[in-house]
Amino acid sequence: MAVAAWIGGAVSLLALYFLKEGITDGGVLYGINRSIHHVDMNIVVIPGAIGSLLTGLLYSLFSHWGFFKHNWLTFKWIVTLTAILFGTFFLGPWETAMMEISGKIGIASLTDSAYLYNQQMNLMFGTLQVLVLIITLFVSILKPWKSKKQA
């Protein structure tokens, strides 16, 4: 359920970006950016990511799967931790900057180089992150790699 919140929330963020097309009111632009920020930080994405991390931790600690017993588990740990760190140090700050800029200068944000940079980075890497998370979901379901050889 946590991964559904994480991926579903991230897809929702991408969908909200497309509401910006044709906007002529700075208040509406700020409202969309604030909504994106709220869905990400408070309601769905971050709680889903934390829930996924905690669920993985509990399964690894209290089941026969372990932490790195299988290659697919190692892959999932790497992706999960990388995605959380990338979201924390890059996607989140880009998103916050967009909200702050549009709150200050309104519709002029759409021609502001800092706003446009943050929007481009967030959209491009946010889309990439969603795709990687979906691939990771399929890896979790299919468990494609055999367990590591025991030494």
Language-model segments: which ranges?
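Polytopic transmembrane helical bundles with strong interfacial aromatic enrichment
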Residues: 1-151
